[in-house]
């Protein structure tokens, strides 16, 4: 069994289906009562690394935010990163990129959204938009010109996997942007060089650590670059198969206390 090569000093956790069971809207007790308190006691930094913006964090996570829990955040796929209330780094789309996306998506009849560090603004309301955003944010703004009022770090586009090839052929992405699927009817649209990995590298430098001191837990496609970057990666038992293949270790399912199991297995806790 592969083991971490260096002492683990910081651990990055994805939110959905890693820390948080989205379908049942809860965080396992093993995380709230054992994992986070014990990491803090040992001086290991627990950090969030998520595709969500801070304004879209689930309510169940809120009690774990603060000096006794999470104070370090890699959000919006590494594009807005902060410690306590201090920003470490921010990346985003240019106005030209946003307006090209709007033009292409309008021509394709696809609804879209703008994501800022705190808000999500959708171009229109429809059943697909409501279903996709329901687990992350219900109090979104409806405003197709929102990007002119507030800096949009990334966009969302609401279309099924069956349209993936059509989107690739449309010229929407070119060689500047990428689409990362997080829902059967929704993708993140971001600059091709941006990912959780970029945010993690910024955070590691900020704290004067080495990447070998970093561990990460995840389950989805937006965790692939993160797994390639950190010193040791752990895929949840419920993770996408491609991520499991990329991981250094595959632990148990989220509802089988997979995070606690792995940390005990490697004697980190």
Indicate where each model-derived feature is located.
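Conserved acidic, metal-coordinating active-site core of Asp-based
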Residues: 100, 104, 108-217, 221-226, ...
């Amino acid at each position: 069994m592969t083991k971490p090569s260096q002492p683990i000093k910081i651990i990055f956790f994805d939110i959905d289906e890693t820390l948080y069971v989205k379908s049942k809207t809860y965080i396992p007790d093993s995380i709230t009562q054992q994992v986070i308190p014990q990491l803090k006691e040992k001086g290991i930094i627990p950090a969030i690394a998520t595709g969500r913006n801070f304004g879209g964090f689930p309510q169940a996570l809120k009690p774990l935010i603060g000096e006794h829990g999470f104070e370090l955040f890699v959000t919006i796929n590494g594009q807005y990163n902060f410690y306590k209330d201090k920003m470490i780094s921010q990346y985003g789309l240019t106005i030209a990129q946003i307006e090209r996306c709007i033009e292409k998506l309008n021509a394709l009849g696809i609804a879209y959204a703008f994501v800022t560090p705190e808000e999500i603004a959708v171009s229109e309301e429809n059943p697909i938009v409501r279903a996709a955003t329901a687990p992350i944010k219900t109090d979104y703004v409806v405003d197709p010109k929102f990007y002119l009022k507030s800096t949009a770090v990334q966009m969302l586009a609401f279309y099924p996997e069956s349209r993936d090839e059509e989107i690739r052929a449309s010229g929407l992405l070119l060689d500047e942007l990428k689409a990362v699927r997080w829902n059967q009817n929704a993708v993140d649209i971001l600059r091709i060089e941006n990912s959780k990995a970029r945010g993690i590298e910024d955070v590691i430098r900020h704290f004067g650590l080495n990447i070998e001191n970093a561990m990460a837990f995840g389950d989805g496609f937006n965790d692939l670059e993160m797994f390639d970057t950190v010193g040791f990666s752990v895929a949840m038992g419920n993770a996408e198969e491609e991520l499991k293949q990329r991981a250094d270790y595959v632990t148990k399912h989220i509802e089988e206390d997979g995070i606690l199991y792995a940390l005990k297995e490697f004697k980190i806790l």
